[in-house]
Amino acid sequence: MLRLANRVSRKDSGNLGIAQLKKRLLATSGVSQGEILSKYPIGLNMHGYVIEQVQPIPEFSLVAVKLKHSRTGSEHLHLDTPNDKNNVFSVAFKTNAPDATGVPHILEHTTLCGSFKYPVRDPFFKMLNRSLSNFMNAMTGHDYTYYPFATTNAKDFENLMDVYLSSVFEPLLTHESFMQEGWRLENSDLSDPKSPIIFKGVVYNEMKGQYSNSAYYYWIKFQEAIYGSLNNSGGNPNEITDLRYEDLVDFHSSNYHPSNAKTFTYGNIELVNHLNKLNEFFESFGSRGIRTNVRKPITELNPNYESDVTVKGPLDTMSSRPIEEQYKSSITWVIGNPLDESKLYDVFKWKVLSSLLCDGHNSPFYQELIEKEYGEDFAVNYGLDATTALLSFTIGLNNLSLEKAKNLEDKVRGIFVEKIIPELQKGKESGFNDRIEAILHQIELNFKNHKPEFGIGLLSSVVSTWVNGLNPVKSLQIDHILNRFKEDYKLNGLKMFQDLLDESVLKDDTPKFKFTMEPDESFGKNLTSQETERLNKKIEALTEEDKEIIYKRSIELAEKQKKEEDVSALPTLTVKDIPREGDFYPLDFADINSKKLQKRIVDTNGLIYMNATKDISYLPSKYYEYLPLFDCCLTNLAGTSKTPITELEIKIQKLTGGVTFNVSAKTDPFDISKTNMKFMLSGMALKDKSQNVYDLWFEILTQTKFDSEDEQVVDKLFTLVKNLGQNQMNTIADSGHSYANSYSNSQLTPTKYIHNLIGGIGQVSFISDLNRKLETEGRDFLKKELLPVLKDIQRHLVNGFTDGNHSGFEYSLVGDSESVIKNEKMIKEFDDLLTANSNRVAGTNELSSLISQFNSNKLGLNNNGRSTLIDLPFQVGYASLAKLGAAYTSKDGAALRVLSQLLTFKHLHSVIREANGAYGGGLSFDGLGGCLNFYSYRDPNPLTSVQSFKDSTSVALGKMINSENNGWSPKDLQEAKLTIFQGVDAPSHISSQGSLDFLEHITDEMRQERRERFLDVTYEDLKNVTEKYLLNGSQDIVTVIGDNETLKIDSSDAQWNIKKLTA
């Protein structure tokens, strides 16, 4: 399950961190808001609930209805929209953590391990393959826990709502579930009662994985220092092992009661249906006093709080910086309380101001701190943050020297006084005004840009403040706040922001807080030593009888995990609920200068989406690993010969919804040994501003500056390469299974080989190499080596062609009929201009040569059957075993996808997560890429998981051979198919309609054929593909990411290739 930090990220630059509040649904229904309002008179009693507030939210095309359950006091929020069939439900609880043992987090897991109505071991995971939901989760925040799902199927909604309510209000909370999901002592070898006793548990290992992420570690230690009263709800691994089972049961009894519950529904299902179900559950409960119990930050609890805190933290072993320059430090100002309803407008102004000061190339803090190399990157807590009752503004940096860390506050104050205030005082002459206009334009676009997860987004935007007493309806009324802001800005201009700063950051008595993390070379070893010490203390306190009990309980738990359960009590959909005919979008086609134009005519609420793609098989393969950097440079370097980057950034934000450039390798849907390279352009705009996208495409493509003699270009590239090198360790820690899979797959197909180069461990190594050269050779490396390569890539991508027909870009449009007609003319003008300004580069088909070398094993990839360990200092590991599968159009592809679901839910979930203690694991089949991937995530024993992967073939064959006796049943097969169709039939973004045809060359006919194959897969098909691909297929390609200090693989072991990633 996910853990949340409620903060406004600097990555949300265009939308101020409230993107999920700014999406308008398409008004396609004939039902007016007046008709909806008439259904909900104030004071009406509906199944034990009384309507307290009804509010139209026209910016979102919905009506908000707030109700209270008369008997228990539970609040319910319903968002009625006839336009969206993707219905959402959630139940949330206020759950203040009493300590750092992780009791709210572990309870979140264990509630989903069986209930009185559904007494099966893990109804949550079992419902994942008995449903057509497109979202199911449970999440723990700082002081709240919530359980949301989304589905387009009304019967499915009813089933899931029943399971969720039973799970949270009447869970079994068995001791076995606590041991499995929380923590336990267990013999390392269950066949040997004398084997060493170790710690195990899903949440325990999840949080060990979190603590391996240095950004998370900095963030959580910062939170503990400034807001210690909240405690660490996720759990500190050092303290999780102090949690008692009785504490878990007591915490549930105290907090999981309707009086402490906030329930939420969204969509087009009638409210009365939801209330009837809720009332059935709640009528057996009495009323409790509602205790919001909002905890306070340290600045309010203690007038003499410690305002300058330093703690020790981990090194970034992949950083090129010396240890003494790996300090992290931040200065934080407390600027308000986000729970104060009267201050909602001030919070919005702060979001705008934070974006103005912190986001993008134009922001003063980026220019003064990053570009001028005071620090290399912003700290994770940088920007505006709203955590419970604390609204704060933080400037923080990574990779500082001790002296710079000590002087950070003076440096930041100097930027405020010498740069920001003078700029604000310029009034209408300030460049800030253009940026304000750009920010407002992005808000307007986000109102219009329809996303399929709209309901989940609205829920996520209100739940953290709602559980703490803020009226959620007020939080949704964005139009009112936005209009007030526009009037205020029109009247007062930039003075409104100067006033904000004068009243807070620049005011001497404003509470502030400095937090620094000192790099500790022995940090990882100390964590390991602390764990060993804790374990030894617990073992020393055990009697021989205790050890016997531990062994017996572990055996019993293992047997229960293996035991086949009767899950007939759980509700389920069937394959009959899946339409045999898929939903397809009509596409039109035309020619533009003999190049294909694909058109999807649909109402897009005043927006137009455009894409272009070009075959770049001619590009020299030596340039592939440079391509992500090149893509990044197009919108992040010094700009173009016509427009500097500061102006270009504003132009993009003021005139469009964004323009992007990227390169990708695509697998041939008929043959996985074939691939093609595509250069893709994307854009989105209001339909009356669409010409700007083509103008920007052309200018950026043809005029981006890569001049070695231009010092601004060199400086920008220096900063960019440094930024890309930051936090690579954290990225791998968060998605280690993806990196392990990518590395394994790179030895199977040419497409996956390229993917690893441009987005996997190969790219991580490449960026590390660039940073190492930057440290040793300085800017000369950029001038003499890197910039000439980037310039040559630009020349090839703009001017090069695959064949003598001078074929270039193909195009696609998604928009209403009028907009598409106008854009056809714009595309022709763009294409003519591009052709007229290009000088053809004669190119060979380099990609064909690479494919040939790959398929004949001439790229040096064959490890001769050896497994690979990517040695990184993580507390937990990630394992991958890859095998070659089948092409998209192969009949085998459908059977392999079904097989992957069966093995995941009917075998691997039990052995990898429940028994081995990993956070997750399974088997996936990439239908487009053709690779099978066994994987584990945040795994304490990745080598054990690898063996489990290898054993899975015999398990699968045994289940199919013994289908009459302890084998896989027709119901199991049905559930596997249901799981697949959760993704196949999930709502899609309107801009992606037709994208499979355009980008992957997968037609509606191919999709329909594959759909029917999914539905028609038999056990005979599964047996055939198991034998063909798992038993007799390609050799096993194994990759493990983890710490060899723990794994202890001998470097001389001929079965292993150990790869150490360092700067």
Swiss-Prot record:
Active site: E108, E181
Cofactor(s), names only, from the UniProt record: Zn(2+)
GO terms, biological process: mitochondrial protein processing; protein processing; proteolysis involved in protein catabolic process
Cofactor binding note: Binds 1 zinc ion per subunit.
Coiled-coil ranges per UniProt: none
InterPro entries referenced in this protein's UniProt entry, alphabetically: Metalloenz_LuxS/M16, Pept_M16_N, Peptidase_M16_C, Peptidase_M16C_assoc, PreP_C
Transit peptide: 1-33
A GO cellular component annotation in the UniProt record: mitochondrial intermembrane space
Pfam families the record matches: M16C_assoc, Peptidase_M16, Peptidase_M16_C, PreP_C
Keywords: Hydrolase, Metal-binding, Metalloprotease, Mitochondrion, Protease, Transit peptide, Zinc
Binding site residues for Zn(2+): H105, H109, E206
First-level EC class: hydrolase
Superkingdom of the organism of origin: Eukaryota
Entry's EC annotation: 3.4.24.-
Subcellular location: Mitochondrion intermembrane space; Mitochondrion matrix
Molecular function GO terms recorded: ATP-dependent peptidase activity; metalloendopeptidase activity; zinc ion binding
UniProt function note: Degrades mitochondrial transit peptides after their cleavage in the intermembrane space or in the matrix, and presequence peptides; clearance of these peptides is required to keep the presequence processing machinery running. Preferentially cleaves the N-terminal side of paired basic amino acid residues. Also degrades other unstructured peptides. May function as an ATP-dependent peptidase as opposed to a metalloendopeptidase.
Family affiliation: Belongs to the peptidase M16 family. PreP subfamily.
Subunit structure: Monomer and homodimer; homodimerization is induced by binding of the substrate.
Protein name: Presequence protease, mitochondrial
Species for this entry: Debaryomyces hansenii (strain ATCC 36239 / CBS 767 / BCRC 21394 / JCM 1990 / NBRC 0083 / IGC 2968) (Yeast)
Gene name of this polypeptide: CYM1
